[in-house]
């Protein structure tokens, strides 16, 4: 294996909603150009952890973070950090497609236009490239100026991925990207993730309950579980093959066996 370079370093991270502690003492590294999966039972703080990686949790009120999250050696929780820039570099795809009520083209171009003025032909190229990167161009190139809301659920989710890719992030966070999709649509999203994994230097972090899928698409896996007080903690982190086949912790083993049968 080539030398692993951390894109994100998490050190002793704890997270609170008001006075309620959701995460406690999480430390791990997310490696550049690798796919890291976050697994664990419902309610153990997986999605909360994901949103800590680009400060999306701060869109809600009364939150508090302790510890450090470093993105290429810069603490993202320093006051001087530009949040818009951070969230372009560490972009996020949510469980359900959150498209704007506008055309396919405008959905993809939206983030590009916010960054600054560019000639229309350049934006056209960016939109086409992002849709191709999301394995969507051939399916919808004849209707990119029609409403994005008319697409199927699977196409809408891949369009959200295209929109994220259009701003050239270094890290892509995906929270249950196949949530609610039928098996065929889910497989297309999985194939897209595999394709991005093989042909790009994009770092991806994926939260999922679908362990068979995670075993196929991820390089590393982190297992989270709530303690006796239902506070989410990192139980074990390592190569996906190791976590799935010979984990160190009995709690990891029990969870993996219960999900895989």
UniProtKB/Swiss-Prot annotation:
Give the first-level EC class, as a single word: translocase
Keyword hit for Nucleotide-binding: yes
Q: What does this protein do?
A: Part of the ABC transporter complex PstSACB involved in phosphate import. Responsible for energy coupling to the transport system.
EC nos: 7.3.2.1
Membrane topology, as annotated, equals: Peripheral membrane protein
| Annotated catalysed reactions | phosphate(out) + ATP + H2O = ADP + 2 phosphate(in) + H(+)
A Pfam family that this protein carries is ABC_tran
User: Quick one: which residues bind ATP?
Assistant: 40-47
**Where is this chain's protein located in or outside the cell?**
Cell inner membrane
Per its UniProt record, what SUPFAM superfamilies does this chain match? Answer: P-loop containing nucleoside triphosphate hydrolases
Name the major location: membrane
Keyword Membrane annotated: yes
One of the entry's Gene Ontology molecular-function terms is: ATP hydrolysis activity
Record family assignment: Belongs to the ABC transporter superfamily. Phosphate importer (TC 3.A.1.7) family.
Tell me how this protein assembles: The complex is composed of two ATP-binding proteins (PstB), two transmembrane proteins (PstC and PstA) and a solute-binding protein (PstS).
Supply one GO BP term.
phosphate ion transmembrane transport
What keyword terms does UniProt attach to this protein? ATP-binding, Cell inner membrane, Cell membrane, Membrane, Nucleotide-binding, Phosphate transport, Translocase, Transport
Domain ABC transporter residues, every copy: 8-256
Query: Which SMART domains does this chain map to?
Result: AAA
Write out the GO cellular component annotations.
Answer: plasma membrane
Protein name from the UniProt record = Phosphate import ATP-binding protein PstB 4
């Amino acid at each position: 294996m080539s030398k692993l370079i951390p894109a994100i370093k998490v050190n002793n991270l704890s997270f609170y909603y008001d006075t309620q502690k959701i995460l406690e003492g999480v430390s791990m590294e997310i490696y550049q150009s690798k796919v890291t999966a976050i697994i664990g039972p419902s309610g153990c703080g997986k999605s909360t952890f994901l949103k800590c990686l680009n400060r999306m949790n701060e869109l809600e009120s009364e939150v508090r973070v302790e510890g450090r999250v470093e993105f290429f050696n810069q603490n993202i929780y320093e006051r001087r950090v530009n949040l818009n820039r951070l969230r372009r570099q560490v972009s996020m795809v949510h469980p359900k497609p959150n498209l704007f009520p506008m055309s396919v083209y405008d959905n993809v171009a939206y983030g590009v236009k916010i960054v600054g003025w560019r000639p229309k032909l350049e934006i056209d190229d960016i939109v086409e490239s992002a849709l191709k990167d999301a394995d969507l161009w051939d399916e919808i190139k004849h209707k990119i100026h029609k409403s994005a809301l008319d697409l199927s659920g699977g196409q809408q989710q891949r369009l959200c991925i295209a929109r994220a890719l259009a701003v050239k992030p270094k890290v892509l966070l995906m929270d249950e990207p196949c949530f609610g999709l039928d098996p065929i649509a889910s497989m297309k999203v999985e194939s897209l993730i595999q394709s991005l994994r093989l042909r790009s230097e994009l770092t991806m972090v994926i939260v999922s309950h679908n362990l068979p899928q995670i075993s196929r698409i991820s390089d590393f896996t982190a297992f989270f579980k709530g303690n006796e007080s239902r506070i989410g903690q990192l139980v074990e982190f390592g190569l996906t093959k190791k976590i799935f086949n010979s984990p160190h912790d009995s709690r990891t083993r029990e969870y993996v066996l219960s999900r895989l049968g």
